[in-house]
């Protein structure tokens, strides 16, 4: 059964049910906010704030929007948008686009243990525009325990091997 929501102006909007293929990913739904830090051999270490929103349309994918800002002065740093799919109950595909001219397809296992959900993904394809920096591989490990989301991101770029780049802890601010 679909839920109905009324917005100002008496516009009725039907909110679809989460697609059955996404049952395992449902704990991601909502908006998450928190802090992280980054490092890489070619840049100075930095701290950032982050907001991530996972949504759905009733189709067999989650929508994903991510934004980061510098912790010291709030200037925009990075953004990503994409889709998360679970073609099988124990496997995830994450399709991402970056405004820096990079696209990623990452795949990997999805495990659930009680209220803990874990994904360990590695890029199977990286697309680059002609002007984008060289990125050869990206890996993400994400864990959701209750209302806490933690992740690490590894990257191979500009001639460097796959290594730690980012880590963050976020908390659910809305479902």
Curated annotation (Swiss-Prot):
Pfam family, one: THAP4_heme-bd
Binding site for heme b: 165
Keywords for this protein: Heme, Iron, Isomerase, Metal-binding
InterPro entries: Calycin, Nb(III)_bact/plant, Nitrobindin, PeroxynitIsom, THAP4-like_heme-bd
Cofactor info, note text: Binds 1 heme b group per subunit, that coordinates a highly solvent-exposed Fe(III) atom.
Gene Ontology molecular function, alphabetical: heme binding; metal ion binding; peroxynitrite isomerase activity
Catalytic activity: peroxynitrite = nitrate
Needed cofactors: heme b
EC number of the protein: 5.99.-.-
Residue interval(s) of motif GXWXGXG: 30-36
Pathway assignment: Nitrogen metabolism
Domain of life: Bacteria
Domain remarks in the Swiss-Prot or TrEMBL record: Forms a 10-stranded antiparallel beta-barrel structure able to accommodate a hydrophobic ligand in its interior. In fact, this fold hosts the heme group, which is located in a wide surface cleft.
Binding partners and assembly: Homodimer.
Family, similarity comment: Belongs to the nitrobindin family.
Function per UniProt: Heme-binding protein able to scavenge peroxynitrite and to protect free L-tyrosine against peroxynitrite-mediated nitration, by acting as a peroxynitrite isomerase that converts peroxynitrite to nitrate. Therefore, this protein likely plays a role in peroxynitrite sensing and in the detoxification of reactive nitrogen and oxygen species (RNS and ROS, respectively). Is able to bind nitric oxide (NO) in vitro, but may act as a sensor of peroxynitrite levels in vivo.
Protein name (record): Peroxynitrite isomerase 1
Source organism (scientific name): Mycobacterium sp. (strain JLS)
């Amino acid at each position: 059964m679909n839920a109905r929501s009324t917005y100002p102006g008496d516009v009725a909007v039907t909110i679809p049910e989460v697609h059955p293929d996404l049952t395992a990913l449902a704990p991601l739904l909502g908006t998450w906010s928190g802090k992280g830090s980054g490092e890489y051999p070619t840049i100075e270490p930095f701290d950032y704030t982050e907001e991530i929103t996972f949504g759905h349309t009733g189709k067999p994918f989650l929508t994903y929007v991510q934004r980061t800002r510098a912790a010291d002065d709030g200037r925009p740093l990075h953004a990503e948008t994409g889709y998360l799919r679970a073609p099988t109950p124990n496997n995830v595909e994450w399709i991402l686009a970056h405004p820096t001219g990079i696209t990623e397809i990452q795949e990997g296992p999805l495990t659930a243990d009680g209220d803990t959900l874990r994904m360990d993904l590695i890029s199977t394809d990286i697309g680059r525009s002609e002007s984008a920096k060289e990125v050869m591989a990206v890996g993400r490990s994400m864990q959701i325990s209750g209302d806490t989301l933690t992740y690490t991101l590894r990257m191979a770029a500009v001639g460097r091997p796959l290594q730690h780049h980012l880590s963050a802890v976020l908390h659910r601010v809305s479902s």
